[in-house]
Amino acid sequence: MEEISKVQTYDELRDYISKYSNMVAKDRALPDIRDGFKPVQRRIITSMLVNKNTSSNKPVKVAKRVGDVMGIYHPHGDSSIYDALVRMNAWWKNQVTTVKIKGNEGSIFGDNAAAMRYIEVNLTPIGDAYGYKLSPEIVPFVKNYDETTDEPTILPAQLPFLLINGASGVASGIAVSIPTHNPIEVINAFIAYTKNNKISLDELMEIMPGPD
């Protein structure tokens, strides 16, 4: 006969909701401070690097790239991958772009990008740079969702992306909203900090006054 355990409903709900919230925050909604990417963005770049969809090569259909990401790395539906890729291309929303869409990319006035079957994409030179030293010796790798291949948990950071491009996302009970900052100011602030890790906040604010 199975043993029946007595538990407190409050404790059980708290534990389950906490685990779910952490999973959503870590695996879907929020960026990692180390490379500045959400999981779907990181997987898009990884797929493009693996398939040599780089700035110097011919662009491929967005539909092909979305299918590859969904089938191998990110089983959360094609629309979330397409939306993320279009957002990564939007120069009017990002200080630095990692992908470049060829075709109707949408507009600053709110026009939508064309359907994924009509437009093509490849990495920008900055996107290419994330392939530099992308190996298990440099960054941690884990098995993908069906354990058929490996994927990086973070990308080798080439820029302080989280500050430069900002981020927004809503998880379960957690949200983030970080504005974009001027890339030159951010890089100069990082250089100043590496030269003097006791630099004051006021001194850093003189170099990087605020969002851009």
Show the residue positions of the predicted features:
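Catalytic phosphate-handling regions of large nucleic-acid enzymes and associated NTPases
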Residues: 1-212
